[in-house]
Amino acid sequence: MDRTTLPYGLFGLDIDPYKEFGATVELLSFLPSDFFPSVRDLLDTASALYRESLESSDHCSPHHTALRQAILCWGELMTLATWVGNNLEDPASRDLVVNYVNTNLGLKIRQLLWFHISCLTFGRETVLEYLVSFGVWIRTPPAYRPPNAPILSTLPETTVVRRRGRSPRRRTPSPRRRRSQSPRRRRSASPASQC
């Protein structure tokens, strides 16, 4: 693949927006395009789960920052699409631009939003394990693989892919302590706890 056809190639730079998070564009490309929810659904999810931390001036995590940037980028694309729709005279050209934005750029934004929301929700390691598991599953001939693809929300309990290094120690359950009959005081939430 030459630099002009790289999905995120720009000005001769081979920039992969997932690299710093341990993933790659290729790893996400194993997931079919219809796997990713609509941009609207992903934005609603991000807003419902992470609105406070996304709107906060505090730096919460690289995933929050990447999510903010993807949301802002989509907003700018929608502004451009609206401008094109209002100013391009030729309906065929207008449709080509709108379809290109929705199909190509929309998919990239859906992938970015899904990846960062999933990392915040399930943890980066779990999402990476899921991507590897799905990649292995999809490349295995149907006769030799389980009928159903791995599911992200159940992956921590059923994954076959293991992290390198020591396996986590199992703790033996401690005896139950008697609970105090008096109500506990709740600490007030600090600004850092929003993240």
Curated annotation (Swiss-Prot):
Region (3 X 7 AA repeats of S-P-R-R-R-[PR]-S): 167-188
One Pfam family matching this protein: Hepatitis_core
Position of sequence motif Bipartite nuclear localization signal: 170-187
InterPro entries xref list: Hepatitis_core (IPR002006), Viral_capsid_core_dom_sf_HBV (IPR036459)
Signal peptide: none
GO BP terms in the entry: microtubule-dependent intracellular transport of viral material towards nucleus; symbiont entry into host cell; viral penetration into host nucleus
GO molecular function: DNA binding; RNA binding; structural molecule activity
Segments of this protein annotated with the region Disordered: 148-195
Mod. after translation: Phosphorylated by host SRPK1, SRPK2, and maybe protein kinase C or GAPDH. Phosphorylation is critical for pregenomic RNA packaging. Protein kinase C phosphorylation is stimulated by HBx protein and may play a role in transport of the viral genome to the nucleus at the late step during the viral replication cycle.
Highest taxon of source: Viruses
This protein's name: Capsid protein
Species annotation: Hepatitis B virus genotype G (isolate United States/USG17/2002)
